[in-house]
Amino acid sequence: MSATATLANAKQSSAPQTAAPKLSERIGRIEVSATMAVTAAAAKLRAEGAKLVDFGAGEPHFATPRHIKDAAIAAIEANFSRYTVVSGIAEVRKAIVERHACDFGSSYTPEEAVFTTGGKLALFNAIEVLIDHGDEVILPVPYWVSYKDIIQYAGGKVVYLETAESENFRVTAEAIESAITPRTKAIILNSPSNPSGAVISRADLERIVRLAHSRGIYLMLDECYAYLIFNEAPFSGASVTEAKEHIIVLGSLSKTYAMTGWRAGFALGPKPIIAAMSKLQSQSTSSTAAMVQKAAIAALTGSQECVCEMRADYIHLRDTIVAGLRSIPGITCTMPEGAFYAYPNVSGLLKKSGIPTPAELTTRLLHDAGVVVVPGEAFGTQEHIRLSYAVSHKDVEEGLARLRAFVAKF
């Protein structure tokens, strides 16, 4: 070896080794969002030229309605692009409470509302300001992927409440009551449900609201899909106005108005909780983008015909995808009562194919069939996959054809 090479090697061996960063204990409590991970994997394959049918992302295939876009454009042209108050301008908070009162019979003031950068931030802020280390939060299974992680990030303990597939995964007041302990601080209800499409009956929801109120337990109502109830008029637990001191409504414009990328959400609740959420928000995102607030006002105060039209299309898409899934050997599927997800049981297919888990099935479907789905493990179950049917009718038919061809190999 030459002297030059020896010197180079010596320098290399004496160079300091980069140590792995020491991350906080808190960040170790959570995982990457499974739905975001699936979206990233699909995007990578698309970039490589793959033609995929994407049942993964829970976002409408519709464009944002014209009048909503026009409101944002007008705001930009008027230079409405500066900071606003953290909780949102008075007009957007007024629009939120008036729309909710009109549609659901609730009773809130603008001071009991905060506008957030997406519904997920409303959930995050609510949990952060209410949950302390060791507090129990009742969470029905299956659950949306982020609930568990956000609770654990706050130091809370998740109390999983199993539901029965034979009963369409519905949550009942009796089941909730059986899960309450002296350490129960909050209950999270998502109706219609992501991922199952289950809808809590109006009677059970009202009983749960009164139960939580009588026990001094906070009830977080995730109403992101509240306008996508298919068999009856939308309803909210916040209509039980005498219990409002223990209710936090978590809302979003993303699904209702096809505004997922706008990041427009809100929370309604008791003034002290909303003030605390605004305080936390003041140290993180601050206000939502000014022009988004103007777009939200247009969405909430303008014609709601677009909401009705999208809901009607989702019903047709639901009927098509459920019938198609039920026709595939090894797959059974409950009938979703709302939202825009099918949550089929694939245990028969796993057994037939020898594929060990829904997660592995998801990988196989992505690479072998070009079909994007989300594994049930992300939602707390071991025999299911989730398909979002908020896609075009053509994509539903193509995706079902690919699924049939994949299953026919076994």
Segments (PLM) and residue ranges:
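Conserved N-terminal alpha-helix of the aminotransferase class I/II PLP-enzyme fold
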Residues: Y83-T116
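A glycine-/small-polar-enriched, mobile loop at the entrance of the PLP active site in fold-type I
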Residues: G56-H61, A75-R93
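PLP-dependent class I/II
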Residues: M1-L23, I27, E31-S33, V38-V53, ...
